[in-house]
Amino acid sequence: MQKKLTGLALAAALTLAATAHAASPSSNEAATARHFAALVAGKEPRTAELSLFFSMMPKGGDLHHHYSGAIYAEQFLDWVDKENYCVNKTTYRIESNKDVVAAERAKPAAQRTCLSSTEVFADAGLYAELLQRWSTKDFYNHGAIQTPPDRTFFDTFGYFGPVASTNTADGLKTLKQRAIAENLSYIETIFELSPFVQNAQFDQQVLASGLPPAALQALLANWTQSLEQDAVFQKSIAAYNDNVNASSAGIDDAHFTMRYQAYVLRFLSPSQVFSSMVAAFKAASLNPLVVGVNIVGQESVNVSMRDYSLHMEMFKFLKTKYPNVKIALHAGELALGMVPPEGMAFHIAEAVDVAGANRIGHGMDIAYENNALGTMQKMRERNIPVEVNLTSNDYILGIKGQAHPITLYRKYGVPFVISTDDAGVSRNTLSNEYVLFASQYKTDYAEIKKLSYNSLRYSFLAEADKQRLLKALDARFARFEAQIAAADQGSKRIKP
């Protein structure tokens, strides 16, 4: 009977690694490749063993990572008491108005409708329901009538929003500890919304029908100049960078590095979006920790669709003004039927051709885009990777397996990286994203290892930091492959 390496055998055999005969790095790599091939062979991949394998495997970076979406609901609930807020037990929303909170606290306990987090934790039924509102927990095994998954996903941010920007230093420390625990050395997190202001006249002008391109550029230039001369607005940018610096103090060390993207919300008014972009680009140009700019928010809602091309022109304008600032854009996070077909025909192409995106987030509607092959060729030739988020693409869009455009990107040579998106909302890990990839698509160890390296190569890190982490990744993989090779040898001594 052929002896197979099981997860239990691998775990037991790791104790033999320290005394195993030293093998060459190349032979260790070959042994690891053979071991991995056995895990994905056949009709049913060995997912438990893949989970162990990827938990152990060094992972370079997580490049599509929303800070607020990465924090688990349990930690947000802890922050409710820290901020002296309460949670409405009927709506499950956080009440931050101090007068309302004080009035609730003055009532007898039986009459309160707004509870402390301690009281929520003590009520098992209420706590379970809150977790289902504040994350996607139990969605697939819950029998009640539910809102659609995309609504459920995006609604979570409204529940924990009042505390999402509090205690950021604690939040980043938690994310660092969790990353180190799963052998992840770098996170590039979409951290905080950049400041913005409203300008009704600007909104009316840029949304005017038939506005010539030159007129739009003039409007953008004029308002940029006004914003640069606005002392209050400039102070808000300085305060933004101060918050990044204070929150991130002590995060970077020999084992872990984190960098930050400023982001704008695509469903706000044009003046709010553009002023937020101006602030984000300025912040990134001044602070080496802020390595890029992103645009986020549900792409399928009316304002996001209406203003998509306008937003790309705004990015183009600011990219010219700040050529060294990198941009990673959520583009094509759409599924057939979400919007009319013409709405799926150009988003990725405009992000690449107009905005000048350095990375594309999601890129899910590529099969429906005009000149999809041409766009993918440009992405391949310009080394513009796609940030692939398998869990959220399945949950929000209902797209997985062979329906996922990762099959197209792989076929046509477009680089891609594996990332988490919102691991706290989806209650997931980067290791599990690799498990999903390996179990759903035919792959080999060489591709898996390349993906780990690419998640650093395509990061927005300064070149010196990038080379430092790549060198460290070499050493980490050498140790990992030696472990796997030794465990493989040791497992042959273990009876099945």
Where does each model-flagged region fall?
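Gram-negative bacterial Sec-dependent N-terminal signal peptides
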Residues: 1-21
